[in-house]
Curated annotation (Swiss-Prot):
Gene3D superfamilies documented for this protein: YqgF/RNase H-like domain
Keyword DNA damage: no
Protein task: Could be a nuclease involved in processing of the 5'-end of pre-16S rRNA.
Name of the protein in its database record: Putative pre-16S rRNA nuclease
Similarity field: Belongs to the YqgF nuclease family.
Keyword Nuclease part of the UniProt annotation: yes
Stretches that traverse the bilayer: none
Length: 160
């Protein structure tokens, strides 16, 4: 059975109370990958996967999930500023549908508007060269996306 693909809050109900999550930032040329600690407090970058073909890309991401005993995924969904879904969001959803056929781990979608821009500003502010930024931007965006999702889940647990 394919993995469920749900908004973050709904996906969280399908994840066990404890266990690492993998955060993914889909770029056109790379996939940034981050992982949380089992208590879901902190996101850390682990790899930038160079995109080649879907099967190879998915195989690498699934291997990273297995290596870290992940129990689910947080996939950044690049919405337009007005909240609508454009071509990039549609492409991300297509990736999620195909990826879900290869795993049973629930996939949570998280609004990633401006994540790459925010990360790029931070890297520029820290004098990271353009060449170095190009190599690490998607991994850092994955950290940003996953940490935002983790923080949202903590806030909901405190409120709820």
């Amino acid at each position: 059975m394919p993995a469920p693909i749900l908004p973050l809050i709904e996906a969280a109900a399908h994840w066990p109370a404890r266990g690492a999550l993998l955060g993914l930032d889909l770029g056109t040329k790379t996939i940034g990958v981050a992982v949380s600690d089992p208590d879901r407090k902190l996101a850390t970058g682990i790899e930038t996967v160079a995109r080649t073909a879907f099967t190879a890309d998915a195989k690498r991401v699934l291997a990273l999930a297995a290596e870290r005993s992940a129990c689910g995924f947080v996939l950044g969904l690049p919405l337009n500023m007005d909240g609508s879904e454009g071509p990039r969001a549609q492409s991300t959803r297509a990736f999620a549908r195909n990826f879900a056929r290869l795993t049973e781990l629930p996939i949570g979608l998280w609004d990633e508007r401006l994540s790459t821009a925010a990360v790029e500003r931070a890297l520029i502010a820290n004098d990271v060269s353009r060449a170095k930024r190009a190599k690490i931007i998607d991994e850092h965006a994955a950290i940003y996306i996953l940490q935002g999702a983790l923080d949202r889940l903590v806030a909901l647990n405190r409120a709820g």
